[in-house]
Amino acid sequence: MISTERLTHLKQLEAESIHIIREVVAEFSNPVMMYSVGKDSAVMLHLALKAFAPAKLPFPLLHVDTLWKFKEMIAFRDQRAKEEGFELLVHTNPEGVAMNISPFTHGSAVHTDIMKTQGLKQALNKYKFDAVFGGARRDEEKSRAKERIYSFRDKNHRWDPKNQRPELWNIYNGRVHKDESIRVFPISNWTELDIWQYIYLEQIPIVPLYFAAKRPVLEKDGVKIMVDDDRMPIGPDDVIKEEMVRFRTLGCYPLTGAVDSTATTLPEIIQEMLLTKTSERQGRVIDNDSAGSMEKKKIEGYF
């Protein structure tokens, strides 16, 4: 019997995402899910757990660790792996470690390329993954807005924005040549507000950094950077202040700006989202390296 129940907006998004996740597992032999520990990763993990419950996830989670993530992110990552019992793969670019790559010394572009992009490509080559789930959304940034749900990559993991396959309705073409792979974005059609509302309704655990609290911050070039450890270079004129801030997006702490906020609960964050007029990625330094920098990074192999 066909159900006549009308799905709510969030339930429609949930159903679409679960369908995509199951479709990839059915089509590909060695999938993996990227786990960056942010809110989008939290939702994607929740959807994957729902898709295969009560069984365990049929694929591992991969975290490319740059060694510059917030300490709270790493603690939360390990805690979730222990709670849910999923297989967690952690990879750090050994060449970057040997060169002592730092966002402070080498700049955001070099750090992101070596520790993130090259680190990711190393992990994908090592484990021979043929499909990689990512938590990118089309409302985040213009290059992601034009990317397909099934995003094809060549043998060097490069993306060609001019060579994308049509996606008609819910039909996805997963055929790839030898050594090619796809990046899959199950939550492409979600917005930032959808993510927060879903987290609230489903009571999904998230990193405490998303909630406002008194935190030590140092303002650099108009961006408030949280002092997360003693590797932060402090100049003679720099002033560290305790301010009520939170993070709308998470990454390497020297490249992620905090925003002034008093939102300490999920309803307050949602209310803030309804009133804000700025992009959630305004605090991501890597997005401002150059014009069209995100698209260039994706063409080089970045997510």
Swiss-Prot record:
Enzyme class: transferase
Any Pfam family matching the protein: PAPS_reduct
Molecular-function annotations in GO: ATP binding; sulfate adenylyltransferase (ATP) activity
InterPro entries: PAPS_reduct_dom, Rossmann-like_a/b/a_fold, SO4_adenylTrfase_ssu, Sulfate_adenylyltrnsfr_sub2
Known EC number: 2.7.7.4
CDD domains linked: Sulfate_adenylyltransferase_2 (cd23946)
Catalytic activity: sulfate + ATP + H(+) = adenosine 5'-phosphosulfate + diphosphate
GO biological process: hydrogen sulfide biosynthetic process; sulfate assimilation
Domain of life: Bacteria
Pathway where this protein functions: Sulfur metabolism; hydrogen sulfide biosynthesis; sulfite from sulfate: step 1/3
NCBIfam families per UniProt: CysD, PRK05253.1, PRK12563.1
Family: Belongs to the PAPS reductase family. CysD subfamily.
Functional description taken from the UniProt entry: With CysN forms the ATP sulfurylase (ATPS) that catalyzes the adenylation of sulfate producing adenosine 5'-phosphosulfate (APS) and diphosphate, the first enzymatic step in sulfur assimilation pathway. APS synthesis involves the formation of a high-energy phosphoric-sulfuric acid anhydride bond driven by GTP hydrolysis by CysN coupled to ATP hydrolysis by CysD.
Protein known as: Sulfate adenylyltransferase subunit 2
Source organism of the structure: Aliarcobacter butzleri (strain RM4018)
Gene transcribed to yield this protein: cysD
